[in-house]
Amino acid sequence: MTEHTYYREPFVRTPEELLDKKLELAQITKDDLIIDLGCGDGYVMIAACQRYGCRAIGYEIDSEIVEMATKAVEESGLSDRIEIRQKDFSEHDFSEGTVYLLYLTRNELNKFSLPLEIHAPKRTRIVTHDFDMPAWEPKETVEFPLMSGDTKFIYLFEK
């Protein structure tokens, strides 16, 4: 038996008021496959699939959060379009997916910068907020004021 060691990022939900702008920036179509690394409760994928008719795969390591996401997907009626994988997302095949919707720390994004550059298909879009992708030049940066008075930055990268 092999023992896997992974680093757990805290589950912090993408602010709802930011979600619309992230989805708009990603230019999602019905033909896209969304990848959400550290998908949490699945609400970002659910919103994308409801609005655009696309498919999605989410990775989450925490079994309790996987249960929460799986239940939310079932309740949304999108089980045929959204798959939740209980797996360390560092094991993801980066040739899979056309849009990556990410809310990860800069340290985590740094780990995926090179695999995305090497393996992601051409024209893959990556949308992050709060943290940019190290070694990637954003195609677009949006400054987004929240109702709380805070300002968030959303980044669009394209391969």
Question: Which ranges hold each PLM region?
Answer:
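C-terminal substrate-binding/active-site "lid" region of AdoMet-derived donor-dependent transferases
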Residues: E108-K159
